[in-house]
Regions:
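Small beta-barrel nucleic-acid-binding modules, primarily SNase/OB-fold domains
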Residues: 2-12, 16-181
Length: 181
């Protein structure tokens, strides 16, 4: 029997691992909402799993609209069973994923993309630096939803010039560093 060279086995293993991560799903109950883009899901085996919503960035808790963003997300998902389509893991070890929740409507139920709902309602930005890992078509929908929310002055867009969370975090780091000197 002929064997594959080790470099091919390594490449094949890496490919299968990335496909496995991309195809992974977590189904569980949301037991905590940290802020407007981070939840904790009680995964199978009673495993609390932190999930960062993919492709969005919501105001931080101490930032203007931070509490409103967190509350909107909590209203959508807290105590409910969600499905997380895993996109990646971040540098903090959190799952990064697209969160889906079933919502009841008069004639049944609809599955809502929670990440998109946060943007549509003006409770988060489309996080352009991290859109490339999303499934086909999602990035465009997220950017379009942000544009619509801005034009119709939804949520944080009622402010004339809301500060994006990535800029706010950078400003906070600068303040801490200048205060330490």
């Amino acid at each position: 029997m002929k064997t594959l060279p080790s470099k091919w086995l390594i490449a094949l293993s890496a490919l299968l691992l990335s496909l496995n991560l991309a195809a992974a799903e977590i189904i569980g109950k949301v037991i905590a909402v940290a802020d407007g883009d981070t939840i904790t899901v009680l995964a199978p085996g009673n495993r609390p799993t932190k999930v960062r919503l993919a492709g969005i960035d919501a105001p931080e808790r101490n930032q203007p609209f931070g509490q409103k963003s967190r509350q909107h997300l909590a209203d959508l998902v807290f105590g409910k069973e969600v499905r997380v389509s895993v996109v990646d893991k971040d540098r903090y070890g959190r799952i990064v994923g697209i969160v889906y929740v079933p919502l009841k409507i008069p004639n049944g139920e609809v599955i809502v993309d929670v990440d998109l709902a946060q943007i549509e309602s003006g409770h988060a930005w489309a996080y352009r630096d991290y859109l490339k890992g999303l499934p086909a078509g999602k990035a465009g929908r997220y950017v379009a939803a942000e544009k619509d929310a801005k034009e119709t002055k939804q949520g944080l867009w009622t402010d004339k010039n809301p500060e994006p969370p990535w800029q706010w975090r950078k400003d906070q780091r600068s303040k801490r560093q200048s205060g330490a000197n």
